[in-house]
């Protein structure tokens, strides 16, 4: 059997990822399904779906961390800060909480989940510092429109925004 080449996405830092990721929204809500959900994530990773997406609001980062614990170097781990926590201090604290729950020293891609009340300047400053501290490898946003993206990349440090994750569920 001939091995088929899979498409990949390459981020600005050279990190590559399968364009089809595993979302985890609604996982972790049933203790009875915990083992099954962990195994499903692990199976996806084994098949090459190395992007695993979670968020602080999903309340399942511990489950996601457990699923990827034995293959962390193979996984591109995505998590998101809630807009209500996206002040400078709030972003840094939310990231620390996520790191603890995920059981990892770094998050590969940390996103602002959607537009909120905090100024983008604060969020961008926090994301830039988290990246410099090695707590996140890349940062970006989720669910932003063109005007928001133009605003973000115009800010000091805004050119570090690696992606806008657009909502698309199958």
Model-inferred region functions:
Residues 18-23, 52, 77-79, 107-112, ...:
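Hydrophobic faces of well-ordered beta-strands that scaffold small-molecule active sites
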């Amino acid at each position: 059997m001939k091995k088929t080449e899979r498409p990949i996405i390459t981020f600005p830092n050279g990190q590559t990822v399968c364009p089809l990721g595993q979302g985890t929204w609604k996982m972790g809500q049933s203790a009875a399904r915990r083992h099954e959900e962990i195994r499903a994530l692990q199976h996806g990773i084994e098949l090459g779906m190395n992007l695993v997406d979670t968020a602080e609001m999903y309340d399942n980062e511990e489950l996601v961390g457990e699923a990827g614990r034995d293959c962390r170097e193979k996984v591109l781990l995505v998590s998101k800060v809630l807009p209500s926590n996206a002040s400078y201090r709030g972003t840094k604290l939310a990231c620390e909480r996520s790191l603890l729950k995920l059981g990892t020293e770094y998050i590969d891609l940390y996103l602002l989940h959607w537009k909120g009340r905090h100024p983008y300047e604060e969020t961008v400053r926090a994301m830039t510092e988290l990246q410099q501290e090695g707590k996140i490898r890349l940062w970006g946003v989720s669910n932003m429109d063109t005007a928001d993206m133009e605003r973000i990349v115009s800010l000091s440090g805004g050119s570090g925004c690696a992606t806008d994750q657009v909502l698309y569920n199958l």
